[in-house]
UniProtKB/Swiss-Prot annotation:
ATP binds at residues 34-41. Heterotetramer with 2 subunits of GlnQ and 2 subunits of GlnP. It comes from the Bacteria. Residues 2-236 form the ABC transporter domain. GO terms for molecular function: ABC-type amino acid transporter activity; ATP binding; ATP hydrolysis activity; L-glutamine transmembrane transporter activity. The gene is glnQ. This is Glutamine transport ATP-binding protein GlnQ. CDD domains: ABC_HisP_GlnQ. It is a peripheral membrane protein.
Length: 240
């Protein structure tokens, strides 16, 4: 479903991804960890073309992301994304935020979009907050609206870029619960996070990126309980 073939990425003279080879299959829940500046968020953002790769090939659901003829909007319909900051429209209610994608991207009529939006708000536990504005919601509630909004365009995969790092500790669990539910439903997910407990419990695969390279790739329970390298062991001790 997602295939990196010898992918590198530069920002000016600085190389942030080095010759990445990676395959992610449908239904996998892949958690990517690594220190700040390691390239993990850049890798994630390349998947739906928020960042352009410098060399190599990147295939997402049969679409060659680095082909200039491929419409980036088509890629982003297939790969929903949730960011560290919620990026909700402040002048729209929770319901209207979730309706936005079906109306503008999928061309749904208003009745269809509202029905879907209400279903998704219920799915993330916010049916009773449908008519609240973002300023009236907690950070955890805003992030759950953001997840519902990403799901509203019916993507084939979901990308999460540190979705809990801006939240107070007591609010993180409600977002992680929604993500766990999605994983159990079989959604293909690629998640950049420092939530090691979540990775161990929910992920089917754990990738450790260091200095722009994939340093470890394997079973989360094995890598977390018995780190095969000193570098991973040091990182896990730092974030635990």
């Amino acid at each position: 479903m997602i295939e990196f073939k010898n992918v590198s990425k530069h920002f000016g003279p600085t190389q942030v991804l080095h010759n990445i080879d990676l395959n992610i299959a449908q239904g996998e829940v892949v958690v990517i960890i690594g220190p700040s500046g390691s390239g993990k968020s850049t890798l994630l953002r390349c998947i739906n073309k928020l960042e352009e790769i410098t060399s190599g090939d990147l295939i997402v659901d049969g679409l060659k992301v680095n082909d200039p003829k491929v419409d980036e909007r088509l890629i982003r319909q297939e790969a929903g994304m949730v960011f560290q900051q919620f990026y909700l429209f402040p002048h729209l209610t929770a319901l209207e935020n979730v309706m936005f994608g079906p109306l503008r991207v999928r061309g749904a009529n208003k009745e269809e979009a509202e029905k879907l939006a209400r279903e998704l708000l219920a799915k993330v536990g916010l049916a009773e907050r449908a008519h609240h504005y973002p300023s009236e919601l907690s950070g955890g509630q805003q992030q759950r609206v953001a997840i519902a909004r990403a799901l509203a365009v019916k993507p084939k995969m979901m990308l999460f870029d540190e979705p809990t790092s801006a939240l107070d500790p007591e609010l993180r669990h409600e977002v992680l619960k929604v993500m766990q539910d999605l994983a159990e439903e079989g959604m293909t997910m690629v998640i950049v996070t420092h939530e090691i407990g979540f990775a161990e419990k929910v992920a089917s695969r754990l990738i450790f990126i260091d200095k722009g390279r994939i340093a470890e790739d394997g079973n989360p329970q094995v890598l977390i309980k018995n780190p095969p390298s000193q570098r991973l062991q040091e990182f896990l001790q730092h974030v635990s």
